[in-house]
Design a protein with these regions (language model features):
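Non-catalytic, conserved peripheral segments adjacent to functional cores
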Residues: 1-98
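Short, intrinsically disordered, charge-balanced linker/junction segments flanking boundaries
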Residues: 100-102
């Protein structure tokens, strides 16, 4: 992937069900499976960050890094400045999970 390339992958979301009565008890979102070939650079670190309701984080700047992001609860809008100077907005949420690769 070139330095200027930004990718995003729409992720699958599956309901999970209780084993006793079958009611929906949550969801499952496969972020990475080795046969999908969505992750092009082997991760060296994985972490989870959270934010309280009504709060905002950012801006946050990384100059040299290959990163993957996905929102697992709520909604996040990633605002990414491309090498051309153009800004790109990518939304990821618990309803519509998107894996962003920068």
């Amino acid at each position: 992937m070139s330095e200027n390339e930004i990718k995003w992958h729409t992720l699958e979301k599956h309901q999970t069900k209780d084993i006793h009565d079958g009611h929906v008890n949550g969801s499952l979102i496969p972020v990475w499976r080795n046969w999908d070939k969505t992750i092009s650079v082997k991760p060296e670190m994985v972490y989870v960050t959270s934010i309280n309701p009504g709060e905002r984080k950012g801006p946050h700047l990384h100059i040299i890094r290959h990163s993957y992001y996905v929102c697992i609860k709520g909604k996040v809008v990633f605002i990414i400045k491309e090498k051309s100077g153009k800004y790109l907005e990518i939304e990821s949420s618990e309803e519509n999970p998107v894996l962003v690769e920068i």
